């Protein structure tokens, strides 16, 4: 990997024309979102706002605004190479015993990568060059973006929240949005199934009414950031996975106010605690669904220490109707999911999460069908195998002659190969995204699977249609004379 920290990565992006420095004064209130949104939709570069209105700290946006930059952040040259990352994760999830010396030799590179999994603990780090504590902490000095006009307050979006349950051996890294409500107060919005929330719940049960320690890193190196959003096995820490991606151990340092280990090269660190008795009403905010979410009470994060580099960069983003940065991340990580799914279900040919489906609410799967009812088995597998798909509402299964990434192909398969009564499977009372206001109950809704495969004996009693195919010899002859026909000659 060609970078060690965020600044190395920005230097790499700038050399490749993938970073634009904006020196003109731009307001974090709405203006940065508008510029970032237009840039992302045009496939443009990462943006470094060097002169944010009213602030001294520059703001970085659209860091992962294209699949290419996500791949670069994972140490790969292009998106297709992300399948290698998926194969590595599949191997780590279920390691296979070598069948021969040759087999052992071929897997040696994967075993060697494991040497980069342990963290390297430093005694001092750049993220603690400047320290503000207690009354000195003032979060209003950070250029926290106010993304949409009806958002209730500025929102921290790219913070890596670091937690540890009282009985767990490893830390958890998760990305949860945080509403600014005071000089040293943020609302920690995490859903109950997420790692940080589970750690907090375990803490409350083991140590009632005691403050729960938390550290939040802003501007960590891309491998660590992406490690927090990648489907790593439960037994593997995000720091360990970042070390695998980077090819070097993740450097960490102990927080000043607690025992949590934080990324040593991060730009800004927030340290503090959650009082189990303190909550606040969060939202509404414009979200990745394209709508404002409902308000709900969540824990309050009290910041006791704010540490940073001497010249920090504030890393931020916005979420809205796709495409946005989370949708781009989802599109790139789609390639990571495929080898993991294929190891469990070898019949899967392709798997696609369309960005228009909020990156996870709809999945299209193509398979090499082998028996009647096969499509339904794959549906159930998608919903149950990885926790990342527990909120996927729709799963469409097609044969391998269909391009999962071409809606024209998929719609043709649905309309010609499926019968609504026979081929639609609806499951009620399943976990659903809390932000999905279409569900009848918050957090609980239904799922639909559509079998758009050709039907086998046992699935239909009718003679099945034969697809039209062109005559190869005729296609070749017309190919040979096509240009001479001059059909599309300029007028």
Curated annotation (Swiss-Prot):
Q: Where in the cell is it found?
A: Cell membrane
- Tell me, what is an example of a GO biological process annotation in this record? ubiquinone biosynthetic process
What cofactor(s) does the depicted protein rely on?
prenylated FMN; Mn(2+)
InterPro entries assigned to the protein according to its UniProt record, in alphabetical order: UbiD, UbiD-like_C, UbiD-like_N, UbiD_bacteria, UbiD_Rift_dom
Per UniProt, what is one GO molecular function of this protein?
metal ion binding
**Reactions catalysed:** a 4-hydroxy-3-(all-trans-polyprenyl)benzoate + H(+) = a 2-(all-trans-polyprenyl)phenol + CO2
The record's active-site residues are: 287
Q: Specify which residues bind Mn(2+) according to the UniProt entry for this protein.
A: 172, 238
Q: Which GO terms describe its cellular component?
A: cytosol; plasma membrane
Free-text comment on the cofactor? Binds 1 prenylated FMN per subunit.
EC number(s): the record gives 4.1.1.98
- Grouped into one coarse class, the protein's main location is membrane
Q: How does it sit in the membrane?
A: Peripheral membrane protein
Q: Which residues bind prenylated FMN?
A: 175-177, 189-191, 194-195
- Annotated metabolic or biological route of this protein: Cofactor biosynthesis; ubiquinone biosynthesis
Instruction: Cite the entry's keywords alphabetically.
Output: Cell membrane, Decarboxylase, Flavoprotein, FMN, Lyase, Manganese, Membrane, Metal-binding, Ubiquinone biosynthesis
Task: Note the Pfam families from the entry.
Answer: UbiD, UbiD_C, UbiD_N
Q: Which NCBIfam families match?
A: PRK10922.1, UbiD family decarboxylase
Write out the similarity annotation: Belongs to the UbiD family.
Q: So what does this one do? A: Catalyzes the decarboxylation of 3-octaprenyl-4-hydroxy benzoate to 2-octaprenylphenol, an intermediate step in ubiquinone biosynthesis.
PANTHER family per the UniProt record, alphabetical? 3-OCTAPRENYL-4-HYDROXYBENZOATE CARBOXY-LYASE-RELATED, FERULIC ACID DECARBOXYLASE 1
State whether it acts alone or in a complex, and with which partners, per the record.
Answer: Homohexamer.
This protein is called: 3-octaprenyl-4-hydroxybenzoate carboxy-lyase
């Amino acid at each position: 990997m060609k970078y060690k920290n965020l600044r190395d990565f920005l230097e790499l992006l700038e050399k490749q024309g993938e970073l634009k420095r904006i020196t003109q004064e731009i307001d974090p209130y709405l203006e940065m979102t508008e510029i970032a949104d237009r840039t992302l939709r045009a496939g443009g570069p990462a943006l470094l706002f060097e002169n944010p209105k009213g602030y001294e700290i520059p703001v970085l946006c659209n860091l992962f605004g294209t699949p290419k930059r996500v791949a670069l952040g994972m140490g790969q040259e292009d998106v297709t190479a992300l399948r290698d990352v998926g194969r590595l994760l599949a191997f780590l999830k279920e390691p296979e015993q070598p069948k021969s010396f040759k087999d052992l030799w071929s897997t040696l590179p994967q075993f060697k990568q494991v040497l980069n999994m342990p963290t390297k603990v430093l005694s001092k780090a750049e993220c603690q060059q400047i320290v503000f504590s207690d009354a000195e902490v003032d979060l209003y000095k950070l250029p926290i973006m106010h993304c949409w006009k009806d958002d209730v307050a500025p929102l921290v979006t790219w913070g890596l929240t670091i937690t540890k349950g009282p009985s767990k051996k490893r830390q958890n890294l998760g990305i949860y949005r945080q509403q600014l409500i005071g000089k040293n107060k943020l609302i920690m919005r995490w859903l109950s199934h997420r790692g940080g929330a589970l750690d907090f719940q375990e803490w409350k049960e083991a140590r009632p009414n005691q403050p729960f320690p938390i550290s939040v890193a802003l501007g960590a190196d891309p491998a660590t950031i992406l490690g927090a959003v990648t489907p790593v096995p439960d037994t593997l820490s995000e720091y360990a996975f970042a070390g695998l991606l980077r090819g070097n151990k993740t450097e960490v340092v102990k927080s000043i106010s607690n025992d949590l280990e934080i990324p040593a090269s991060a730009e800004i660190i927030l340290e503090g605690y959650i009082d189990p008795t303190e909550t606040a009403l969060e939202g509404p905010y414009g979200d990745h669904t394209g709508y404002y979410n409902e308000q709900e009470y969540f824990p309050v994060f009290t910041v006791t220490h704010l540490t940073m580099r001497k010249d920090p960069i504030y890393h931020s983003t916005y979420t809205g109707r796709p495409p946005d940065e989370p949708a781009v991340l989802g599109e790139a990580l789609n390639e990571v999911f495929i080898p993991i799914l294929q190891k469990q279900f070898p019949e899967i040919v392709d798997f696609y999460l369309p960005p228009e489906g909020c990156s996870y609410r709809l999945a299209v799967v193509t398979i090499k069908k082998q028996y009647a009812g096969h499509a339904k088995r794959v549906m159930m597998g998608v919903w149950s195998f990885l926790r990342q798909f527990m909120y996927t509402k729709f799963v469409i299964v097609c044969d391998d002659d269909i391009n999962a990434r071409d809606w024209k192909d998929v719609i043709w398969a649905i309309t010609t190969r499926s019968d609504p009564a026979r081929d639609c499977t609806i499951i009620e009372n399943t976990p659903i995204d809390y932000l999905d206001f279409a569900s009848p109950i918050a957090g609980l809704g239904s799922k639909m699977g559509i079998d758009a495969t050709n039907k086998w004996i046992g699935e239909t009693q009718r003679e099945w249609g034969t697809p039209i195919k062109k005559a190869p010899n005729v296609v070749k002859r017309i190919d040979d004379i096509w240009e001479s026909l001059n059909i599309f000659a300029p007028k």
